[in-house]
């Protein structure tokens, strides 16, 4: 919440944008590229159908916000890089990973990014695209004030508006990928706002509303993923448990808003579990 592809640098005029929790982010994008050859001893026996790569390389693209970008996690290996490398190892090919995620991005920003010739070129030759987007679209403070003592129906209008753009993003990514058996993955969120210890410090109303938004959002993302024919990955359960009550503080960076190194490892495992 990224892919033999040549990563084309994309320069976009970005504006500071607050995350759902109201925190501001840097104005720059931080792409990362990892290319490796898998030694015979590290290659899994099975090869993932549809993710065998082409030309001896499996290309992965990451798109989205500060979560896949790796914000607030110093020297982290993001889950985008982990998945891209691991899936290439499974297929006994080289890994080419282009993480085009940008801190602070909203759905509208990704839609603009998808119009860039560089992004279209990158997706055209990618075997796997991983998307995490939507959290920054929610004005959490306003929604908390309005829905603190209401049920889930109070946030549905806010979620519906975001989901329409998420659908368009996924449809455009899928259409842009021309590699045979190319795969699109979209993740949900463990929380669209702050979580763990930091989240609890914001108060019960904040925790109630952000968890409600997250559950409604994730449910709708899963539904449209099924309709469009892309892979949905539940990341809330690995972070917070089946009942949503597990303390995920150790999986988060100090800001309580982004994954820690351990959190990125958990995200990677969740994504890989959904890929054959």
What are these regions (language model features)?
Residues 165-184, 216-233:
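A structural motif corresponding to the C-terminal end of an alpha-helix
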Residues 26-103, 120:
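Serine-esterase "nucleophile elbow" of acetyl-processing enzymes
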Residues 189-276:
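Catalytic His-Asp segment of secreted/periplasmic serine-dependent ester chemistry enzymes
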Residues 66-69, 101-108, 135-140, 190-195, ...:
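Solvent-exposed loop/turn segments at secondary-structure junctions
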Residues 70-164:
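Conserved SGNH/GDSL esterase-like catalytic core that processes O-acyl groups on lipids
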Residues 59-64, 68, 96-101, 127-132, ...:
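Structural recognition of the beta-strand scaffold that forms the well-ordered cores
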Residues 46-54, 110-129, 168-181:
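Short amphipathic alpha-helices and their capping/turn segments at secondary-structure boundaries
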Residues 1-25:
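Hydrophobic single-pass membrane-targeting/anchoring helices
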């Amino acid at each position: 919440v990224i892919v033999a592809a040549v990563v084309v640098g994309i320069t976009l005029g970005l504006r500071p944008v607050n995350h759902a929790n109201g925190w501001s982010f840097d104005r720059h994008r931080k792409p990362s590229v990892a290319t490796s050859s898998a030694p015979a001893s590290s290659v899994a026996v099975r090869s993932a159908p549809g993710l065998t790569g082409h030309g001896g390389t499996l290309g992965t693209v990451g798109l989205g916000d500060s979560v896949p970008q790796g914000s607030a996690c110093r020297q982290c290996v993001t889950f985008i890089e982990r998945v891209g490398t691991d899936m290439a190892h499974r297929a006994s090919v080289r890994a080419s990973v282009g993480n085009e995620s940008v801190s602070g991005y909203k759905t509208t920003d990704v839609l603009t990014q998808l119009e860039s010739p560089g992004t279209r070129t990158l997706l055209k030759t990618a075997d796997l695209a991983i998307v995490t987007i939507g959290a920054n679209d929610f004005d959490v403070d306003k929604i908390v004030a309005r829905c603190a003592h209401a049920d889930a129906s109070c946030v549905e209008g806010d979620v519906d508006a975001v989901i329409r753009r998420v659908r368009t993003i996924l449809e455009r990514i899928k259409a842009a990928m021309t590699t045979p058996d190319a795969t699109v993955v979209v993740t949900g969120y463990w929380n669209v706002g702050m979580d763990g210890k930091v989240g609890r410090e914001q108060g019960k109303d904040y925790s109630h509303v952000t968890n409600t938004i997250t559950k409604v959002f994730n449910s709708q993302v899963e539904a449209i993923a099924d309709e469009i024919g892309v892979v949905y990955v539940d990341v809330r359960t690995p972070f917070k448990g089946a009942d949503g009550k597990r303390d995920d503080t150790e999986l988060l960076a100090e800001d309580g808003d982004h994954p820690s190194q351990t959190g990125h490892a958990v995200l990677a495992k969740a994504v890989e579990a959904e890929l054959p």
